[in-house]
């Protein structure tokens, strides 16, 4: 046997097997296309649609999160401004209240001083009136005694001293 005959015979066997393999492969492909390709293709399409939907949903959620973050940032900034305004108003109110309290206290103190001065002036006036009355009474009493009896200078001095001692008691 020569190499050509071996090659020809072996080539012929391989060609027959190759045709058979091709035929089986073609039948297998037709069966796959008919029974499996549709469901696999549908499954791949559903998967593609789900991925697209998930990406769209993620983008939407990200936009919502950004919007919410911006709203919260704005609310935080607004609340800080409100807190600053409240503190400012509280300080202003406290200063105004303090001024009002001091003014009221000054008015009360002035009224108390005025009343005390008036009372002191009245007490002084009353004391002076009482002293005048006593001096007048003493003068009248001395005059009565002097008139009732003619006294010497020594007797007059003793009489005045007795009246002064009587005032001390």
Swiss-Prot record:
Tell me which PANTHER family the record gives: ATP SYNTHASE SUBUNIT B (PTHR33445:SF1), ATP SYNTHASE SUBUNIT B', CHLOROPLASTIC (PTHR33445)
Q: Look up the record and report any one GO term of the cellular component aspect.
A: proton-transporting ATP synthase complex
Annotated keywords: ATP synthesis, Cell membrane, CF(0), Hydrogen ion transport, Ion transport, Membrane, Transmembrane, Transmembrane helix, Transport
Q: Which CDD domains match?
A: ATP-synt_Fo_b
Q: Say what the protein does.
A: F(1)F(0) ATP synthase produces ATP from ADP in the presence of a proton or sodium gradient. F-type ATPases consist of two structural domains, F(1) containing the extramembraneous catalytic core and F(0) containing the membrane proton channel, linked together by a central stalk and a peripheral stalk. During catalysis, ATP synthesis in the catalytic domain of F(1) is coupled via a rotary mechanism of the central stalk subunits to proton translocation.
What residue intervals traverse the membrane?
Answer: 12-32
Pfam families from the UniProt entry: ATP-synt_B
* Stimuli inducing this protein: By low pH.
Q: Which InterPro entries match?
A: ATP_synth_b/b'su_bac/chlpt, ATP_synth_F0_bsu_bac, ATP_synthase_B_chain
Protein name (record)? ATP synthase subunit b
What gene is it encoded by?
atpF
Is the keyword Methyltransferase in the record?
no
């Amino acid at each position: 046997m020569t190499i050509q005959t071996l090659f020809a015979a072996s080539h012929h066997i391989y060609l027959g097997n190759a045709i058979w393999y091709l035929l089986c492969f073609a039948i297998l492909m037709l069966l796959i296309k008919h029974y499996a390709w549709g469901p696999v293709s549908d499954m791949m399409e559903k998967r593609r649609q789900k991925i697209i939907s998930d990406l769209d949903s993620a983008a939407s959620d990200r936009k919502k999160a950004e919007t919410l973050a911006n709203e919260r940032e704005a609310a935080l900034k607004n609340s800080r401004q409100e807190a600053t305004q409240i503190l400012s108003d509280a300080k202003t109110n406290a200063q105004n209240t303090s001024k009002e309290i001091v003014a009221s206290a000054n008015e009360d103190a002035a009224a108390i001083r005025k009343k005390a001065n008036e009372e002191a002036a009245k007490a002084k006036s009353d004391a002076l009136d009482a002293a005048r009355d006593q001096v007048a009474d003493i003068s009248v009493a001395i005059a009565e005694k002097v008139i009732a009896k003619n006294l010497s200078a020594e007797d007059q001095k003793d009489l005045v001293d007795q009246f002064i001692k009587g005032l001390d008691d």
